[in-house]
Amino acid sequence: MLEILWIALAYVLGSAPWGLVIARTFCGIDPRESGSRNTGATNVARLCGFGWGVATLLCDVLKGAVPVWLAFRINASPVFVSMVALACVLGHVFSCFMKFRGGKAVATSIGIFLPLAFWQLLASSLLCMLVIWRSGFVSLGSLTLVTALPVALAVSGQWGWLPLSLAVWAVVVWKHRENIVRLRSGTEKSWLKSKNKGAAAGNAAEGDDTQNMNPQDAGRKDG
């Protein structure tokens, strides 16, 4: 009975829309209506700034990590712990606080594996960050992470968590289906391109201001 209640509680905790709470409370923005219309850390970072994106990421990771860590202490059975972990992920994807809509579950998926397969998760996360750094696509990095994790678990002999990692892979890939289409068509948003466009726009604006100045003002600016 305790196990069933804990699975239900894990779903409710996973449903907590921290991205929506943070963006609305501190930025006055509804992330469901702006940017990529997603409550995840990436969209919150785009709309509210890097710091609030990190805060969202941490909250979404913790709402996966804490219930799973406690579940492991209640009953270390891989079946029970996996059900609790999957409940956290499904809560994020189908939030009971947002009419059963939600995010893409990458951060919460990271959270559930923190207490279960730390080193395998670390290796997959480093590969994820490398892909994001090289390509500029957060979505591609996220897909790399959930694809690499089952491989890392299998290679290291952690068979108990392999079914969970495959279920998480299926959920995350399904939630990224539109991103996959955009990646294939070359229309996916890139962090690198966004930064370059912002820098170019700033340089263009500065150039326009200089052209509009009289010679004396331009001289003072150069000095």
Curated annotation (Swiss-Prot):
Lipid metabolism keyword on record: yes
Places the protein is found: Cell inner membrane
GO BP, one annotated term: phospholipid biosynthetic process
Main subcellular location: membrane
Keywords: Cell inner membrane, Cell membrane, Lipid biosynthesis, Lipid metabolism, Membrane, Phospholipid biosynthesis, Phospholipid metabolism, Transferase, Transmembrane, Transmembrane helix
Membrane topology: Multi-pass membrane protein
Pathway membership: Lipid metabolism; phospholipid metabolism
EC number: 2.3.1.275
InterPro entries: G3P_acylTferase_PlsY (IPR003811)
Gene Ontology cellular component terms for the protein in this record: plasma membrane
Transmembrane segment boundaries: 2-22, 52-72, 78-98, 112-132, 153-173
Region (Disordered): 191-223
Pfam families in UniProt: G3P_acyltransf
GO MF term list: acyl-phosphate glycerol-3-phosphate acyltransferase activity
Catalytic activity: an acyl phosphate + sn-glycerol 3-phosphate = a 1-acyl-sn-glycero-3-phosphate + phosphate
Domain of life: Bacteria
Subunit structure: Probably interacts with PlsX.
Family per similarity comment: Belongs to the PlsY family.
Known role: Catalyzes the transfer of an acyl group from acyl-phosphate (acyl-PO(4)) to glycerol-3-phosphate (G3P) to form lysophosphatidic acid (LPA). This enzyme utilizes acyl-phosphate as fatty acyl donor, but not acyl-CoA or acyl-ACP.
Protein name, entry field: Glycerol-3-phosphate acyltransferase
Organism in which the protein naturally occurs: Desulfovibrio desulfuricans (strain ATCC 27774 / DSM 6949 / MB)
Upper lineage: Bacteria, Pseudomonadati, Thermodesulfobacteriota, Desulfovibrionia, Desulfovibrionales
